[in-house]
Amino acid sequence: MWRSKNLRALCDRLDLQLVVKAPPGAFADAGAPLARLSKPVEAADEDALCACFNLGSDRDFRSDPCFGLIVLSEIASKALSPGVNDPGTAIHTIRAIQRVLHKWSVTLAEKADEDTDPEDQTQRVFLPGISVRHALECGFDPISFDGANRPVITRTLLSALSGLKAQDEALFSAQADELAQAMLA
């Protein structure tokens, strides 16, 4: 996770641009750069920039949005296990994932409206977004696998994907269709 306000302030002060290469929750490989700078900086400034990143061995909901989808998906998968056999909880969890993804799409739309200032030529920090495909896979793939032999789960998953498409066709349509086709294959 990064602290974008701190990054922006530092980049403003140093008059540079910074491109973050890894999305939140990504595995940070010691051999791969976390970010690229538009120009070299002093060691102290490099340390200050590095301090804006939160690296650790554990994922958390605040800094890694897809982690929340994964945890919800694991709850549904556990509910579908033979020892638990609780499809109602799995269905409830699928709907919770749908609500989370819908809220995300609304937030993205609001953010896009805020970011359309043609006068702002001072963007300093470029952060990677979370892909729709990745979000849908984190939320629905494990449930689809574990619930493949349960028509009620497949119907609920397809209904959730259809609902997401209806709520934001431009954002969800292509990936939701691909995931639905994979579920039915």
Regions found by a protein language model. Name each.
Residues 21, 27-28:
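Residue-level "contact hotspot" at macromolecular interaction interfaces
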Residues 1-16, 23, 32-185:
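Short basic (Lys/Arg) and small-residue
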